[in-house]
Amino acid sequence: APPVLVLLFHGAHAALHAIAGAQRRLQRCCGQAAHGQPGFAAAVLLQSKLVRFKPLLRTALFAPVVTTLVAVALIWRYLLHTRYGLVNAGLGWLGIDPVDWLGDPRWAMPAIVLLAVWKNFGANMIIFIAALQAIPDELYEAARLDGARRWALFRHITLPMLGPTLLMVSVLTLAGYFQLFAEPYVMTQGGPLQSTVSVLYLMYEEGFRWWNLGQASAIAFLLFVLMVATTQVLLRLGRRGEAAASA
């Protein structure tokens, strides 16, 4: 057979094998991306007039973003230790049995997702705060003169004005979770029972641990196509939302 056909056959076989192995990881990443919006709630709360010490709270919530990920992951690994971790110590004070956070397949990935959310949501919070501060106060004042309440202000002014920002943060958050690597690499090495193997970690193992370069390349290409397709879907949904709001 011609060399080109041989290469295409092997590439297709590697891609199908990689897709079969990465399907669960892709679904998990899509589920994790839904946890990337707590920064919006924090930004709205910090913009409220009821909150005091706003600069201090902003600094405290943004601090995890600028810390070294490896150091933070190591600290979290000790915090979640089964016997000596502070988390299980707190559960013990409440009369709850200790949980093997990083050794139980049911809890390992939620623990890593919690770390990722805590580490990164401060960046989204700053973006949302900047977008909230850019909304003209005249819009709120005019709505209050018409008798609008807080929920109406939030629904008809804040959310429509934050539409492009919400879209951008959704795309960035999804891309970030698809690239989840350092957290499982430092905390669990993909275990237990490969329950914390992300798509990027699977690509790393196939390419640099087992030297299955064909499968690693197929996973990388699959990840690229999936991210482009998902971004296009989000952009189309954003354009539809803007069209509906302006209609």
Regions found by a protein language model. Give the residues of each.
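A structural signal for multi-pass alpha-helical bundles of membrane permease subunits
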Residues: 1-247
